[in-house]
Amino acid sequence: MDSMKKKIAYLLLLLMLIPVGSFAKEKRTFEIKDGHFYVNGKVTPILSGEMHYPRIPHQYWRHRLRMMRAMGLNTVATYVFWNLHETEPGKWDFEGDKNLAEYIRIAGEEGLMVILRPGPYVCAEWEFGGYPWWLQNIPGMEIRRDNPEFLKRTKLYIDKLYEQVGDLQVSKGGPIIMVQAENEFGSYVAQRKDIPLEEHRRYNAKIKRQLADAGFNVPLFTSDGSWLFEGGSTPGALPTANGESNVENLKKVVNEYHGGVGPYMVAEFYPGWLMHWAEPFPDISDSGIARQTETYLQNDVSFNFYMVHG
């Protein structure tokens, strides 16, 4: 075994030795307090991997989730794809590979906590960022802004989502520990400077309010590039940074937008990268990922591998 393989094996062992409690089939508590994540009253880092339920045949969900647990992770994160479920106005589908609730239940049975990322915009290299195509046919519709027609539809979506998975929150004995409000909204704010910042912030706050009004009562969070928190963060939600490798910068910017304290999390830590036509294959080294993982672990930084599978 060469030195790099030894280092990766060591990191996997270290991940598995971090105390995460006996999660499987056990009711747990989760809270953000004193700058840390607490599981069952103990400071616990979130060691997460992203895996999207519709990108894996449902017959393989349990096997893949079990593999995630075996590699030392304690959490799985997933987007929720609005256009996957509401294929036509008012026509909902949560069967088969779309059975989000079953996916979450299996994750809990396999000892994993769950981070839910419902958008309503999700990016994820998914058609229309997860928005249903038919939104474009509604008169007066302006997506992703403080628009009555749009917010009416996002409310229906979020309420329907709560019907499916609300009882699976950790507050009700389930595995869902956190829910993301919007998604990388700071990037959109940076691109849409024609819209006043205050309007962007109103919209962002209203999505957060819709989640709370529907019944989601676990901690909410946002995820953005660390230089985009001004537009992407929203009061009452933990700001997390995507792709941030500089721990000092991560802690500085989170402190600025979160009352001077953590916890600190990289909600998208990239062990791979997407490929575009006619571009060179992304060159990401195993050794670099191993070193960065070690840095996070040594500095009380939680993370979510984007992606682990799927």
Predicted features by range, described:
Residues 23-75, 105:
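N-terminal carbohydrate-binding accessory modules
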Residues 245-310:
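Catalytic-core region of carbohydrate-active enzymes that cleave or remodel glycosidic bonds
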Residues 11-19:
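Bacterial N-terminal signal peptides
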Residues 99-116, 139-176:
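An active-site-proximal structural segment forming one wall of the substrate-binding cleft
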Residues 61-127, 208-213:
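Aromatic-lined substrate-binding rim segments of carbohydrate-active enzymes
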Residues 41, 68, 76, 107, ...:
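Conserved, mostly hydrophobic/aromatic
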Residues 153-231:
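Active-site neighborhood of glycoside hydrolase catalytic domains
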Residues 90-96, 120-144, 190-200, 236-243:
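Aromatic- and acidic-residue-enriched segments that line the glycan-binding/catalytic groove
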